[in-house]
Structure formats: structure tokens, C-alpha cells
């Protein structure tokens, strides 16, 4: 979805220059910048695209990594093949990884120094996110047992899709008990803007609410 919102034409058809391909091909810094890093609709923000097909790579990443990257730790690939090559070209590098328990997520743990976890207050989503957070130490141990190093300096939870409702306030209070000082004070509100701006491939900052079809909120 980040690819679609930031540069929607990169989400149409087959995209070969994705993060997953860059990880496996271990291209040079120059090739990364020339072929994989793409400018977006937002000035000063670049993106390496992702695609649906990357999920198939994730499902068999260990096999592919052993074939294309013999001798390299499969959980260090993102850090060594992409982040280390680009870290001096950008002030911030954001890794947008879903909570799927696969090699891509574990690569994200190794490559990141700060981990942000959005927590929706809806009961089922809230419960599953807390379960995910509960499993983090186990996932970190699994990654380090494989020979990788977790260098995370901080892990923050924050509320997302929150409205002025009593059950949402209760969820926020519970998350504060779980995270303590490691909870961001700022929350993302439940807003039609987040759902509708994508229809025009805009953002909540670039699209005027009065142009949301069928909704004025």
C-alpha cells in the first residue's frame, strides 16, 4: 500500500525492481540508486517498491537466499544488501513490514534501530496485536540464535484508528499499562481521510476532504 500511495504507477503491472529482488541480487549502491530507488509524489521522499509477488519470495526466502546468497545469514540480507549501502544517502529510512512471521519481518528486526507498532483499538485487532507484541522476545531469540544481531534501541507502541469512544479509551489505557513509557503520546485518529484519499492516489495532506466522494467528514 505504501508503494501505491507514494507512487501509484509502480503498483501497476509487473514490477521487477522491488526490495525483495534487490535483497536477493545484492546489487551495488550505484545500481540500487539508479534502478531500484524511485522518486515519489512527495518531494524529498524516495521509495524502493514492493509488490504482491514479493510474498511468494518471502514464503521461500530461505531456499532462495541459500541459492543466490550462499554463506550469507538469511536474516542479515536486508541490513547488508540494502540498508548499509544507502544509510548515508538519507536522513531516515523507513522499513514498512507487515506483521507476518516470515523472513522479511526478521530481516526488519535486524535492520532497524527503532520499531513502531500501530495498535488498533477494535477488540479483535487489539488482541491480536498484543499477542504479536508478546511474541517479540521469542522472535528476537529465534533471530539471534540463527547468528544475527538485534540492535533495536527502542520499541514504541501507538494507537491507530482511534475514535472518541469509551471502548477505544479503555484500549488506550490498557496499552499504556503494557508499554509504559514506551508508548507514543500521539495517536492516529479513525478518519475517513485515511480510507478515501487512496481513491485518488493522494495522501491525507494533499487531498481536500470536500473532494472525498460521498463523504464530507
Please tell me what each predicted stretch does:
Residues 1-217:
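P-loop NTP-binding core
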